[in-house]
Amino acid sequence: MSGFQSSLAGKVGILTGGTSGFGYAIVRALVSQGANVAVFSVDELPAAASLEWQRSAPGKAEYFTQDITARGASEKIVEQTLACFGKVDFVVVNAGLAIRFEESLLKLSLEKLAAAMRTQFELFPIALATLALAAARVMAPRYAPIPPDDTGHRPDSGAIVVTLSETALSPLRDDLLAYAAAKQACLSVMRSLAATLGPQNIRVNGIAPGFANTAGPRKFYGRFPQIRADIEAKTHLLPAFMDPGAVVPAVLYLLTDNYVTGTVIPLDGGYNIELKRYFQDQ
């Protein structure tokens, strides 16, 4: 089919933040598709958890402990991937941590706000830009020379996918100001990279998940159970926490399609619509 790679088998990818949540679900899917993935996370994955599901998978995942905000981390990540698998075909930038404020913004220490902003920007847009470009410098010599087929489309391309957030599309909550600002900056970086790397036959896209059954949302609703109850009582959409694996089809699509770039796919079951309505009504 024009516009699609036939398979991820034999492809090599980099994924950050792959020991839990979205990242872990994506890694398992990629390996099941025959891809080899170098996974980088500040948290170590228990050996048993890594080996059990890999035994029957056609691909392979190698785990490395790495803080993506450390000096020289992006170059090191690419170098380790090349040493392990010999090439880079795609990158999934997924690592993240949301800083939430307990106080209202009018009462929040400005020093605390500034520190949170610095941390979130280092973790999201800065890490995205540096890792994407470090990987692109390796991918471009292989992918830029690929000629178009008789339909005018190139039969293969490099790919970068970034995990954004519904807060990047509709930043509404003051407790997530730093996180939302950093994710919005990621959106800008993603689009700039798409424009810059397109001529090199490297596509750059994003997914924007909503509240999922991961640690952050569970903690938020644990603090504010009435918000969840209020939203779920009046929504006609899909109120439940999304399973982390729900992002997998979108990620696989963005990694295998050879035409789409500069695009964000929202993945929140319509939940953000009701969340926006809730906060606007308060």
List each language-model region with its residue ranges.
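Conserved glycine-rich cofactor-binding loop
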Residues: 12, 19-20
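Catalytic loop of short-chain dehydrogenase/reductase
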Residues: 97, 110-116, 140-185, 190-199, ...
